[in-house]
């Protein structure tokens, strides 16, 4: 009783129409003409499924390539921004070095000046 009951796969997540699934014949015996028509029908169904699969794969490939190129563009833009930040920081370091050197020279000048003033006051 259970052997005659066929369980059909869950087709809720299937994108294809149910008619693409091979149908089980209820008749116990099929003529040779019926068998050749059936195998021709199955072959054309397989060809259709193969074409549909190739189209789906092609579409997915295009979509993946689009996402990868978008990702590469974003990375390129971020790299350009990072490079501009590095250039700006380099400029700030150079400016800080110039100011530091100026302040060191100024301190030495003031030190010499105070030495002269101190020597003058001691005389």
Swiss-Prot record:
Gene Ontology CC terms: central element; chromosome; nucleoplasm; synaptonemal complex
Biased composition (Low complexity): 31-41
Pfam families linked: TEX12 (PF15219)
Localization per record: Chromosome
Keywords annotated in UniProt: Chromosome, Meiosis
Protein's GO biological process: meiotic DNA repair synthesis; synaptonemal complex assembly
Classification via InterPro entries: TEX12
Tissue and organ expression note: Testis (at protein level). Detected in ovary. Expressed in both male and female germ cells.
Coiled-coil positions: none
Region span, Disordered: 1-41
Biological function: Component of the transverse central element of synaptonemal complexes (SCS), formed between homologous chromosomes during meiotic prophase. Requires SYCP1 in order to be incorporated into the central element.
Assembly and binders: Interacts with SYCE2.
Protein name: Testis-expressed protein 12
Gene of this entry: Tex12
């Amino acid at each position: 009783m259970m052997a005659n009951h066929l369980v059909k796969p869950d087709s809720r997540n299937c994108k294809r129409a149910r008619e693409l699934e091979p149908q089980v014949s209820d008749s116990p015996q099929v003529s040779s003409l019926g068998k050749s028509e059936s195998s021709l029908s199955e072959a054309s169904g397989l060809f259709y499924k193969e074409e549909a699969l190739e189209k789906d794969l092609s579409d997915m490939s295009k979509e993946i390539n689009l996402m990868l190129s978008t990702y590469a563009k974003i990375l390129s833009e971020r790299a350009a921004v990072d490079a501009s930040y590095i250039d700006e920081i380099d400029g700030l370091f150079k400016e800080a070095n110039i100011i530091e050197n100026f302040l060191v020279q100024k301190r030495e000048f003031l030190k010499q000046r105070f030495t002269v003033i101190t020597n003058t006051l001691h005389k």
